[in-house]
Amino acid sequence: MERAIERVLISAEEIERHVAEIGKQISRDFEGKDPIFVGVLKGCFIFMADLMRHVSINCSMDFMAVSSYKGTTSTGAVKINKDLNEDVEGRHLILVEDILDSGVTLNYLKNYLMVRHPASISIATLMDKPARRKAEVYADYSCFEIPDAFVVGYGLDYNERYRNLPYIGVLKPEIYS
Ligand code: IMP
Ligand code: MG
């Protein structure tokens, strides 16, 4: 598996440090607000699991599963495969994503959830690729700003593989072809 990786972009130790930091920051910002963390599956699963262990306030968790159609003729359409179980009216939502790329997915989700009248919607992302942004959406909490490269590991996949790598790596170009 690791032979497919060109280089390590972010080590496991570095991830641990930054995730702990935003966990503390969110705990300060949402003290007494009982937020709901909304994980966007599948990419969020390792990040969210680690992040939650650094959140020290009362909160709950829920998950959504989405898929986006991205081909060459991208319509920006996002399909909801699993919706929330909890009622979010009047609640503070924190969307947890693996990576903010074009922003199409999170922009869609924000609008989709807004009509349920939550008290607020914030975004926590492990990585942000600002160079590729198409939609007007910004992360409130971001661990790493990265260049425009396709990365895998720590929950992120290429064709469903490499999610189990403990670090963030850049794939070798020949893997794509
Ligand atoms: P967006 O709608 O373009 O912001 O896409 C966000 C989703 O695309 C993420 O949740 C990932 O699932 C996927 N994605 C974007 N960039 C990468 C990457 O470099 N590696 C793996 N998945 C990515
Ligand atoms: Mg994802």
Protein language model annotation of sequence segments:
Residues 1-177:
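PRPP-associated nucleotide enzymes
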